[in-house]
Structures are given as C-alpha cells and as structure tokens.
Amino acid sequence: LRYFAHRGLHRFQAEMWSEDEWKHELDWLLKKRFNMFMLRIGGEDIFPLAFPDICDFAEGDAGNPERHGFDDRTPISTLEERSQLRGAICKMAKERDLIQPVDCGTMTHWYSRTPQSFIDSEKPTFLSQTTSIYADKCGLVWDIRDDRNLENYFRITKAYVDNFGHDGLFHTIGLAERLFSADRAENLELKKYTYRRISEFLKKQYPASKLLVGSWDFSMFWHNDEVSALLDELNPEQCIIFDYTSDTLDEKTNFENWSVVGRFPYIFGIFHAYEPSNGVRGDYERIERRMKTAAEDPYCKGFVTWQELSHGDSFMLEYTAANAWQPVGNSRAELLPRYCTARFGKLARMFERIYNELYPVTSLFVWGGDKENEANNFFNDYTYDQISTLI
C-alpha cells in the first residue's frame, strides 16, 4: 500500500494521522499480510537534513500566500513535526519488518517541492517544460544532465537513508506528468536518459539495491513500443517496473502490451481511483483477466495498490490483500460473501445483494488516462461518459 499527500477528510488522508493512528494502520497492514508500504507526504522535511547549512524547518512553516492550488504546500503541521512523525513511522515499520522504498532521482513533484532557500542558494538549473503543470520554480525538475543537480538529488536520498534507514529498495517517478519538447522523439530521449542516469548513479551509491520504476508516466504519456524500447536500456537485475496502473480503462496501453510479460521484472498493481473518488467502484472482470496474466508470469514479482486516498473502498483493500498472496479462489464473486459476513454481520446477505445489484453501474467507474488529450488527463473521470451511453 501507499499513502498519499492529498488533503481532505481525516479518514482518507494519511498526512493528517497521528503517531497512534499510524501504529494502528501498520498493525492492520500486518494483519492483512501486506509487507511493503510507501509514505508519500512530501519531501520538504528532508531538505533541512540534507542541506542543514541552507534550509531549516522553520522556512516551510509559513507557507507562501502567493502560491495557489498545487503550488500551495502550506503544511498542516510544522516541518519539524512532520520529520519527527516520519521517523516514528519508519521506526514502527522497521519493527514490523515492513519494506519501505526510498525515493531517488528526479523526485520534485506537486507534493514534493524545492524550498525557496535552496533555489536562492544553490541556483539549480531546471529542465524547461512545454507544459504549465508544476511550472512554479519550486515545482520544476532540476536538470540532472548537470552532475551537481544529480548529486544534490541523491543528497536528499542519502539524508533519508541516514536518518530513517532503507531496505535496499529505491523508487523513482522519472519525469512523470511532464513534457519538455514539442518533438515526441526528443521528449522521449530525455525521459529515457533520466531513467538511465538515475539507475546508474544509484548502482554506484548502493550497489546491491533494486530500483522500482514507477509506471504512471507510461500509462499516460508513452506508447507501448516506447516502453519496450526503454526496457532494452534498463538492467533487469536492478530495475523492476512498478506498475500500479494495471487496472486502467485503456485496453491498448497497459502492462500486457509493454513487453514486460515473460521478459522483464514487474509488479502488478491497482490504482483504482483518483483522490476525489471515494465510493465503491471498479471493473473486477477486467482486473481478474489481467491479473491471471500476471499470476502465471514468473516475471511478476508482487501486487500493489496505489489509491490516491487511503480508505475509500474497503472491499478493494480486502480484495488486494487476498489476491496479493493467492490469486485463485479470491475473485470478486468468491470474496464478496466472506467480506460482507465479516463486515456487516447479520446484515451480510442484504449488503451482498446491494453490492451485486449495483455492480453493473459501479463496474463502469474505472479510472484511465486520456491518451488523445494527454495534457488534460489529470483528475478526469470518464465514468459519466460511459453511463450516458446507457441512458
């Protein structure tokens, strides 16, 4: 499981949980036999640890009233409190033998901004974007063709490792959600170069490590043959494709067509929903068809769920927990009666009937990137377009 930095109702948003609530959550992970989790609450609190002579915790506490939307990262708590909570969570996770991947490389994103003090002092060169998303300087990616920028990114990783530990597993998003050239081939070459540069530098710093390569950008911006070409340039002994988009609505661009099956290590995963979508949803027939492919493939190394909110659809969490270890005998049809009995007790059969009667509608709620209008594929949900065809 992974826990994200969106903000909203307390139940759904891990950034708002206390240490005691995190203890309860990590114990729940063990109960459900999950063995890995990712904490995605931003990296601003790592900068004072990585660059103590430049950045301090107090800088991030005031926020910036001139920035709005994604650019406004006004903290819910102080950065120092966040850092202390991160340390407590990592310690509890280690005590429970949970794997914790560590971010590396071009990690700047909407939820992980560069402090203004670092920009003013270090003056990193940035990659120029052709899209406006995250275009504020604090959200731009440093140009890692410059050795100094790459080394500084890895100073953040080292600070995390030194303060919170690591299990030999690292993670990169590459240049996800961004375009840097109007020329598709030029844009692709830059993205491929970035993956190579990160993996090669990581190999030097942590020789025995593994690198999870996030699939988010593949699902939205890459063509199948482009993903396949990237695999030719990555080391399968080091890299694992971290595909948390296996349930996408898109039948053309998904792991089955990337040439990973039977060829390159990958993890099968369910994204399930964008942050605003907190209801029952999902096309389980689509998931189970693709899951069968992964379950029969020795190159598939695991199962992950990467929802943008933490406890939106409780059935999907139970479904993931069951199928991650045994993808036989745990189909939606087989699991639903057990789930309803455990969750609803005497009302189990009534809720089972409700779930089944609503399924023809809830199965239409499937996330998916808009490949035809790539710049518009964030937080769009095409469910209503599908439902309108039935009316």
Regions found by a protein language model. Name each.
Residues 1-45:
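An acidic-aromatic substrate-binding cleft motif
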Residues 8-9, 35-65, 71-355, 359:
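Catalytic-core regions of glycoside hydrolase
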Residues 20, 25, 31, 145, ...:
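Enriched - but not universal
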Residues 29, 58, 307, 379-380:
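Compositionally biased, low-structure terminal segments
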Residues 359-391:
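C-terminal functional modules
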